[in-house]
Structures are given as C-alpha cells and as structure tokens.
From Swiss-Prot:
It comes from Homo sapiens (Human). A lipid is attached at C538 (S-farnesyl cysteine). It is found in: Cell membrane; Endoplasmic reticulum membrane; Mitochondrion membrane; Lipid droplet. This is Cytosolic phospholipase A2 gamma. Changing C538S: Has no effect on membrane localization. Decreases the affinity for 1-O-hexadecyl-sn-glycero-3-phosphocholine acyl acceptor in transacylation reaction. Highly expressed in heart and skeletal muscle. Changing S82A: Abolishes enzyme activity. Reduces lipid droplet formation.
Length: 541
C-alpha cells in the first residue's frame, strides 16, 4: 500500500528515481552487447502515439522487434498515449515476454470472441460508484471488445520488474479535460496527467498521489475515504477515450437508451436478467458502428417518436417506486439484476446528457500547498485521452528532471505523421523547453511522402528520432490504402488474423530497417565519436 498523503515535490518521485537508477545497470549491459561502450548510461525514451487498435497492434510490433534486436534493453522509459498504452501495459502484465504477448494477440484475433457477460458484470459494478462516467462504459463495453481483453490487474502490480530494473519505466498519459481551455489558449503544462506503477498526478506541478490511492477521496492533502485501486481495463478506457465525432456518438448513446425504457423492456420481456442484459448491451455496443453515421438506429417497433424516450425513461424511472418497477418479476434474484441494469441505464443516460468522462476525486482538493485555486477548488477531476492535446506523450518525457537524451518517437497516426512534431514544437517554444525546431515548410514537404525515419537535432535538448508507421519505404505508393485498411475507428470484428499479422510485420520492419540509424544515435548520446551525416539541426536519415 502506498502513502496515504499527497506528495508535492519538484523533480522525480523517490520511487521512480530508484527504479531509473537500477535500470541504468541493465542499460549499460545492453549497450555492451550492442558493442557500444559507455561510462554512463544515456537515458532513452520510446514513445508510442495514439491510433486506437492500429496503434495497439503496431506498438506491440515495435516493442517485439526492439526486443529481438536487443534495443529494448537499452531503453529507460516507455511512454504512451491512447492505443499505445494498451500495448505497453500488456508488456508488463506478461512480464516482458514478447513471444507470449505476440502469440496471445494472434490468438485473441483468431477466435474472434469477447466475454459479454463478464464485461456486463464489470460495467454494472462500476455503475454503483458515485464517480461513474462514460469512461467506465467505454472501458468495459467498448475497449475490452476492441482488444478482446478484460485485464483485472493493476498498475501497482508492475512494480517488481520496474524496481528491479529488468523493464523500462512506463509512463501512461492522460490530460485534465477541465483544463482544456488553458491548453487551447496557452498550452498549459499542468493540463498533462501521468500514471506510473508508483504514482498518478501532475508532473508540471510535482503533485502526485500513490497509484494505489488514485480515485480515493482526499481533502487538505489527507486521505478521507479509500476506494479500491482501479483495474487496468478501466485505465485503458481512460487513456484511450478520444472519440472521432462526439456529437454523433452522443446522439447514438441517446438513441440506444431511448429504446431501453421500462415500456420497451416489458414489451421485449426476456426470460431472465442475463438475457435482458445481452439485449441491452447488444444494442449499446452498436455505438461504434454508428460513430461515422453509417448505421442510423432503427425506429421503435411501435412507431412512436424516438426523441421523447430518453427523457421519459429517466423521469419515469426516478418517480416509480422500486416495488412497481419490479412487479412483473417475482424471482428476487431477477429483481435485483433488473434493478441494477436499469440503474446502469439511468446513470449512463445522465452521463451522456452531460457528456461526462473520466470522473475521479481530486486529490488536490483544498490542498494548501497548491497556489492555483482552480486546481485546489475542484472536488473532481475529469481525465481523458491525452491525444486530444498531443497524440504522443512528448510533454511527459521532456522535463529536465527526467534527463532524456534520445527519444524514439513511433507515430501510428492515420493522418499527418508530423502533426505531433508540429504540436510539440509549438508547446516547447511557448515554454522555452529545448526541442529541435523544424520549419513548417519542411514538415509540409515531408508529410507528402513520409520516409521511415527522421532524425531531429537541436543545439540543446534530446535528439528525436521520428518513425511514421505508414511510409514510402515500407508502403511504397500505397500509403493511403494502408491507412484506409487500418482506420482508427475500425471495429475489431474486421481485424482478421491476416490483417493483424500484416500490421505487426510492417511495424517490425520499420524498426529492423532503421536499426543502424538507432545504433548510431545511441553511440552519439553515449558520448562516442561518430561521423555526422550533416551539420543541419534537422536532417533526414
């Protein structure tokens, strides 16, 4: 169990500092195997971008090939946004066994199965929480279906390999959605929120809470009420909650809930609560199918106007006594199940009407050590996908306290693979953070026909190697076709084993074909002489 107090300390938390120090020994051994001699281990960070299931699979391919080439052992930090967090977290739940991890991935997409009943049970359980939000629904009923996984382990379970230094230190990114206006206006660093096996919090403020107490209630820096540590399924939903078209999805949630009034349930009466649950969630899970407006919900069977159903359901369900609600069913167990289901429907409808995501207790509430009143006056935080700010977690590895020398940025975007570089350049310029400066015209030129690797260097700060997934070296002239095949909002049901294997192979090839370039930059940051290709601050490699 972690500390029950809030920590406000500039710099690295002591647990991370110790883990990184232990990791240095493993990095030095790995460099020696790669024939790179160094007195000090350089700090290398690997970043995985967002991109839904495409990013999940491609990131696994990258990690697998880096392990195969002996490169992963030379990495100090692994950081991810959205879909990449699903892959990175899997690395730790499998104790770093990439062969087993890859085999498991292929198996999941061979059988095309998903445990609806278990996901239903987890969602109903989550709906009993005072902080239930659409993130819970998204995590247990959408992301679990996309990944074919429902992990019940926790971030704190990852401590052992991290503290022993056998695996890189992982950082999972989110942003505080309530601070989006500050981000839009000034790219405020405190917008970014991070999760590690030890802590969760705002790195820009140096304000953290033990990961085991993330979600618990604090006041004035003290623990008031303990809540169980959230499982990885929920966190994956939080980290991967960026949506393509919020208005379309909001309307679809409403459309589905309108069909689930008491009237609708009684008319479609099913033999038991379990089958009712299947009926409800089979309809709710069409949320993704209509996220692009391709499959509009059907009219109600009775021909009644759909636009009044949600309001009617919420009002009637609130007013009707529990006894009357359950009158048609005499089985006590069935009564309880039905009540829980309808409570879930009601709560989901309310969250959808408010579009409420990522609700959790604010551990900085009434904290005297925080001068920013916005941070300390809120009872709740609303944490969402960091890809809504920058689709790669550069802001979490750039602080000087982490002393990163080399960044390997793997971009799994379906669109412009340099948008993350543009956004990070702007962020760093505003806050005087060392980062290679690239001219907009050059980025525009690169984006028209991306190569597989770009090396960006500035006078100070880390060297950045940027690897677009879809590039002319691997895809030839078919980049657009590849992008269409692996669309961000493509359902997992369309991912056959062949489609998965092809994407894994593409991601691996990008690492393998650029191994020499990576080794060269490792030599450079390790302090060894190696001839430079160019004196330019940014060069294509």
């Amino acid at each position: 169990m972690g500390s029950s107090e809030v920590s406000i300390i500039p710099g690295l938390q002591k647990e991370e500092k110790a883990a990184v120090e232990r990791r240095r020994l493993h990095v030095l051994k790995a460099l020696k195997k790669l024939r790179i001699e160094a007195d000090e281990a350089p700090v290398v960070a690997v970043l995985g971008s967002g991109g839904g299931l495409r990013a999940h699979i491609a990131c696994l391919g990258v990690l697998s090939e880096m392990k195969e080439q002996g490169l992963l052992d030379a990495v100090t930090y692994l950081a991810g946004v959205s879909g990449s967090t699903w892959a990175i977290s899997s690395l730790y739940t499998n104790d770093g066994d990439m062969e087993a991890l890859e085999a498991d991935l292929k198996h999941r997409f061979t059988r095309q199965e998903w445990d609806l009943a278990k996901s239903l049970q987890k969602t109903i359980q989550a709906a009993r929480s005072e902080n239930y939000s659409l993130t819970d629904f998204w995590a247990y009923m959408v992301i679990s279906k996309q990944t074919r996984e429902l992990p019940e382990s926790h971030l704190s379970n990852m401590k052992k390999p991290v503290e022993e230094g056998t695996l890189p230190y992982p950082i999972f990114a989110a942003i505080d959605n309530d601070l989006q206006p500050s981000w839009q206006e000034a790219r405020a660093p405190e917008t970014w929120f991070e999760f590690t096996p030890h802590h969760a919090g705002f790195s820009a403020l140096g304000a953290f809470v033990s990961i085991t107490h993330f979600g618990s209630k604090f006041k004035k820096g003290r623990l008031v009420r303990t809540h169980p540590e959230r499982d990885l399924t929920f966190l994956r939903g939080l980290w991967g909650s960026a949506l393509g078209n919020t208005e379309v999805i909001r309307e679809y949630i409403f459309d589905q809930l309108r069909n689930l009034t008491l009237k609708g349930l009684w008319r479609r009466a099913v033999a038991n609560a379990k089958s009712i649950g299947h009926l409800i969630f089979a309809r709710l899970l069409r949320l993704q199918e209509s996220s692009q407006g391709e499959h509009p919900p059907p009219e109600d069977e009775g021909g009644e106007p759909e636009h009044t159903w949600l309001t009617e359901m919420l009002e009637n369900w609130t007013r009707t006594s529990l006894e009357k609600q359950e009158q048609p069913h005499e089985d006590p167990e069935r009564k309880g199940s039905l009540s829980n289901l309808m409570d879930f429907v009601k709560k989901t409808g309310i969250c959808a009407s408010k579009w409420e995501w990522g609700t959790t207790h604010n551990f900085l509430y009434k904290h005297g050590g925080i001068r920013d009143k916005i941070m300390s006056s809120r009872k709740h935080l609303h944490l969402v996908d960091a890809g809504l700010a920058i689709n790669t977690p550069f802001p979490l590895v750039l602080p000087p306290t982490r002393e990163v020398h080399l960044i390997l940025s793997f971009d799994f975007s379906a669109g412009d693979p340099f948008e993350t570089i543009r956004a990070t350049t702007d962020y760093c310029r505003r806050h005087k953070i060392p980062f290679p400066q690239v001219e907009e015209a050059e980025l525009d030129l690169w984006s028209k026909a991306p190569a597989s690797c770009y090396i960006l260097k500035g006078e100070t700060g880390p060297v950045v190697m940027h690897f677009p997934l879809f590039n002319i070296d691997a895809c030839g002239g078919d980049i657009e076709a590849w992008s269409d095949t692996y669309d961000t909002f493509k359902l997992a049901d369309t991912y056959t084993l062949d489609v998965v294997v092809l994407l894994l192979a593409l991601a691996k090839k990008n690492v393998r074909e650029n191994k020499k370039k990576i080794l060269r930059e490792l030599m450079n940051v390790a302090g060894l002489y190696y001839p430079k290709d160019s004196a330019r601050s940014c060069c294509l490699a």
